[in-house]
Design a protein with these regions (language model features):
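Single conserved hydrophobic/aromatic residue that forms the stacking wall/gate
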Residues: 2-13, 17
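Short beta-strand element of the alpha/beta-hydrolase
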Residues: 29, 39-49
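Cap/lid segment of the alpha/beta-hydrolase catalytic domain
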Residues: 47-140, 150-151, 196-200
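Mobile cap/lid helix-loop segments that gate and shape the active-site cleft of serine hydrolases
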Residues: 122, 126-129, 137, 144, ...
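Alpha/beta-hydrolase fold nucleophile elbow
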Residues: 155-164
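Gly/Ala-rich beta-loop-alpha elbow adjacent to hydrolase catalytic centers
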Residues: 164-168, 172
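Short beta-strand/loop motif that positions the catalytic acidic residue
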Residues: 231, 238-240
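C-terminal catalytic histidine-bearing segment of alpha/beta-hydrolase fold enzymes
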Residues: 257-300
Length: 300
């Protein structure tokens, strides 16, 4: 495991929390720190996919020290998927240290390494030949993010959570399953069974950026819900939308049932929350209020 090396590039302050841009392992990140005396609980805020690569961390934290076009891009995205809010900023206002970085091919890492599907598939293919995966790199980066957050003097390392929408949801439950650093996770709009996602026309069948969440041979042993259930007995929250065309409701319900069986088998059924909302593929203000209140109960 390589040693951690960080450098603060810039910072800004608000009435509630201070913000800084950190660079570690040559990857820019946002860190939001509440004002007041810590240590504080923390959240790793994991951005979505959205087939929109010009921004990454800026989808979950209001950008600063950026060009006007980045600010406008982020504001439009927040309005489209997050009810006009930046979830990282909302969590910082609630007293959390918030960490957000770009996944490979998004934001600063997209502008530098290419944002087109051909480049993504080319890298994914080359990684497979090296015995690695794009999804594995994303998850490893998120694990290291949690390790970094735990090392911050402002953070209580026993109270770290993860939250994300869409691909950020996939990243959240993967991180909770893979890292003992993360104590709880809120995973929004990325959970179903593999058969339900392999229907003609679904994004999972198109290749392209699907490689960001695909692990070869995994399906021979585990489905997505089984991987997420490795997080048991941690508190976990899963929301999906009944009108979400990407995740068929029957597949979502089957996946939820698989996870409930695991938490129930460990006599911690009360630590798993699953809910279908009458919405599409979004994390709106009402959903945020319920998810953040749940996180407060387990991390504050």
């Amino acid at each position: 495991r390589p040693p951690r090396s960080t450098q603060s590039r810039s910072s800004a302050a608000s009435d509630v929390y201070k913000r800084q841009v950190s660079a570690f392992c040559r990857v820019p990140a946002y860190v939001l720190v509440p004002k007041g005396k810590g240590p504080f609980p923390a959240v790793v805020a994991l951005h979505d996919h959205g087939a929109h690569f010009s921004i990454g961390k800026e989808k979950v934290v209001r950008p600063f020290d950026e060009k006007p076009e980045v600010l406008e891009d982020a504001a439009r995205w927040a309005q489209t998927l997050y009810g006009g809010r930046f979830i990282g900023d909302e969590l910082a206002k609630r007293g959390y240290v918030v960490f957000a970085m770009d996944a490979l091919f998004w934001g600063d890492r997209g502008r530098r390494e290419g944002v087109d599907y051909q480049a993504q598939q080319q890298l994914a293919a080359n990684l497979l030949q090296l015995g690695m995966t794009w999804a594995g790199i994303v998850t490893w980066d998120d694990i290291r993010s949690a390790e970094f957050v735990a090392s911050l003097p402002e953070v209580d390392p026993t109270r770290i959570g993860a939250v994300g929408l869409s691909m950020g949801c996939h990243r959240a439950w993967m991180l909770c399953a893979a890292s003992d650093r993360v104590a709880a996770g809120a995973a929004i709009c990325w959970m179903a069974t593999t058969p339900s996602l392999m229907r003609p026309g679904n994004n999972q069948t198109k290749g392209q950026s699907a490689y960001a969440v695909l692990v070869p041979d995994l399906r021979n042993w585990l489905d997505y819900a089984d991987v997420a259930a490795i997080a048991c007995p941690k508190p976990m929250l899963f929301f999906n939308g009944e009108k979400d065309a990407l995740f068929p409701v029957d597949g979502v319900k089957d996946a939820y049932a698989r996870m409930h069986r695991v938490w129930s088998s460990q006599r911690v059924e009360d630590r798993l929350v699953t809910k279908l909302w009458p919405v599409a593929h979004v994390f709106n203000e009402e959903m945020q209020a319920e998810a953040f209140a749940w996180m407060d109960r387990h991390l504050r």
